Amino acid sequence: MSSLPMFDSVSRFLPTANEDEQFWWKLTGRHMARMMHEAGYPEDRQVECLLFHRFKVVPCLGPRPHSDKPWYKSRVGGGAADGCPINYSWRFGTSDRKPHIRNFIEPLGALTNTPADPLNEVATKALLRDYSMTLPNVDLELFWTFAPHYRPRIIEKADMEKLAGASLLVGAEMSPDSRNIDIKAYMYPRVPSQTSQLLTTILPQAMRDAYGEDVCLDSLNLVRDFMTNDPEGSQLTLTGTTGIDCCKLQDTRVKIYVITRNTSFDHIAAIMTLGGRRPISEELLNQLRALWFELKGAPADFTSSEQLPAQTKPDGTKNPIVVPFYFDIQPRLALPDVKAYVDVSTSPVSDLAAAEAVVRHLERHGSGQNPKAYMNVLQDITPVEELETRKGALAFYSIAVKKNELDITSYFNPQVYKRYFAHEVQLNGQRRSAFE
């Protein structure tokens, strides 16, 4: 793999860091540098984003690993992850746009995993406030308005202990042709009753509080109607997860995440088109079907009305397939955008085969720019033999329709804990991490 001159130059003049920050910088800083290098980011943008990562992300990643078991299991990365508080995404983009990279973190602080901060909110809110003071494009008005609506109103200690866990995540998008770093926040209601009230009570009131009493809720109401009355939409289940943009109020989006357990492609297509309300060309639906079947290990002629077979785990039990989506709500738009997620961790195909399938699709249809650069990134983070034989590097592929082509993003994990002893050596009877 080629060298990373920007990472080496930045590292050369950094002040001495503590052991934890030094570990996270050497590992995740190199990952970020590799992604930007392969994506063709301008050199000055690479330096800018690396400095942001070093001073605004790395200090929030907590103690360095000292075993293959996380001291706090972060929610970042979904079911494929190993508890590491950071993962990455590579948006292939479209034929006229370079790849965009992002990272997602759950900030960890002094109060994380203690009774003083059972929902792990303190470090995240402090980080967001810091971003709002140092990044001129960041505006937290929507976040501060929404956050109280998602917080559980519980005073009983036993109840709070049951609900302890991640309630907030932060995403940072670093596009190649901008001076901005775009921040996103993700909220998770911990009380089940809050999730069931999301579309009927919580979101309508939160949006009125944020945008004003006369805010147009047509897009939100359409989602609620679709999930209530449409035979396909009524099979969706709210997860409670809500994503928002931390920018000027007039430009913000609200993302509502749902899942379905119906894995037939006809059902997937019905959700993507909102039951025909958002038409997608037959050509694009055919592309989506072919990619869906390939990523899920189904033959190309698999019947579109049939359910995909569940994967059998090593212990003989079945691994049910869940398909996530999100609806992108914007008050100024009557129709929400829809994005589907393909969970690679529940697929019988290897991580390498899944990645190669996506690259073939992009090359076949002339989409994206230099999709093989993505393979260089994956193989730099995880050895090829592990991509071929193990699961966990890839989390999801998301698929949306933009400008009459499929817009695909890959979400992948550094596997800091899972690979801790991957290349262990014996040194004076001690195990030694491959990252040391």
Swiss-Prot record:
Its EC number is 2.5.1.-. It holds the Pfam family Trp_DMAT. Keywords: Transferase. GO terms for biological process: alkaloid metabolic process. GO terms for molecular function: prenyltransferase activity. Signal peptide: none annotated. Prenyltransferase; part of the gene cluster that mediates the biosynthesis of neosartoricin B, a prenylated anthracenone that probably exhibits T-cell antiproliferative activity, suggestive of a physiological role as an immunosuppressive agent. The non-reducing polyketide synthase nscA probably synthesizes and cyclizes the decaketide backbone. The hydrolase nscB then mediates the product release through hydrolysis followed by spontaneous decarboxylation. The prenyltransferase nscD catalyzes the addition of the dimethylallyl group to the aromatic C5. The lineage of its organism: Eukaryota, Fungi, Dikarya, Ascomycota, Pezizomycotina. It is an enzyme of class 2 (transferase). It comes from the Eukaryota. NCBIfam families: arom_pren_DMATS (TIGR03429). Belongs to the tryptophan dimethylallyltransferase family. PANTHER family: INDOLE PRENYLTRANSFERASE TDIB-RELATED, PRENYLTRANSFERASE ASQH1-RELATED. This is Prenyltransferase nscD. Pathway: Secondary metabolite biosynthesis.
